[in-house]
A protein has these predicted regions:
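Active-site scaffold of zinc-dependent metalloenzymes
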Residues: 46-77, 92-106, 111
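N-terminal targeting/trafficking signals and adjacent low-complexity tails
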Residues: 1-21, 105-116
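Active-site recognition of the HExxH zinc-binding catalytic motif
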Residues: 83-95
Length: 116
């Protein structure tokens, strides 16, 4: 069974990245960060509180969970880690609806260049 542990240090990095790139629409009180270890190629993934879940649980505000596969994430450079964090943050739409934004790789590259 996969075990998840909170990753407050990754949340702090994400807050810094968002601050530098003017991603002010992200409410970090409703974005949660976790590490896990698993034998997959995935480095990170984001999960939202989709509209159908919001209908079932109307008393819960939309939120996001970003998980990092420590086995893969820790192997890459800090710059690549920051790009991965940024990539996941860019999936959060300006409406903070619990859904995802589709992002073009050119947008990720442009924002990455702004961050560096």
């Amino acid at each position: 069974m996969v075990e998840y542990t909170e990753a407050p240090e990754l949340k702090e990095r994400a807050i810094k990245i968002a601050g530098k790139l003017n991603l002010a629409h992200i409410d970090f009180d409703r974005v949660h960060f976790y590490r896990y270890t698993c034998d997959t190629r995935t480095c990170a993934k984001i999960t939202g509180f989709f509209k159908t879940l919001q209908l079932a649980y109307p008393h819960i505000n939309p939120f996001y969970v970003i998980t990092f596969n420590d086995k893969n994430f820790s192997r890459v450079s800090e710059q690549e880690q920051n790009q991965t964090i940024l990539h996941e943050l860019l999936h959060i739409p300006k409406t903070f609806s619990g859904e995802f934004s589709k992002i073009a790789h050119s947008k990720i590259y442009k924002k990455s260049r702004e961050f560096i």
